[in-house]
């Protein structure tokens, strides 16, 4: 019963924050639990969900290339802009942080609870976007490594 209550609270928070991704995710989980598929679906999502999500995000990022909106001409033009270089370096940094985040979440799953809470707070209070857990885990991973060096 506790998972249903917790998910319902998250649904209410998602509705108050008008966060469609959180609402859809919670409704999906409530339906899976309600129709008795949780023993099959949830372990799979727990194991492969982040990779599936990363794959979907990667597909979305590559769509402009597939549609022809971004081609070699746009690529060549973009390297002439300082903002493009800043964006490229930011993309590299975020990808490396996310890599550390995936490793941390796999190694230390209880960190997920704190990351999810932080993401929910950011989404509901500050109109943030719910991609935080992966990047948050990456930032936590880097900070934990720094703490390890000094302790």
UniProtKB/Swiss-Prot annotation:
GO CC terms in record: plasma membrane
Domain of life: Bacteria
Localization annotation: Cell membrane
Topology versus the membrane: Multi-pass membrane protein
Keywords on record: Cell membrane, Membrane, Transmembrane, Transmembrane helix
Pfam hit, one: DUF441
Family per similarity comment: Belongs to the UPF0756 family.
Protein name listed in UniProt: UPF0756 membrane protein Aflv_0503
Protein source organism: Anoxybacillus flavithermus (strain DSM 21510 / WK1)
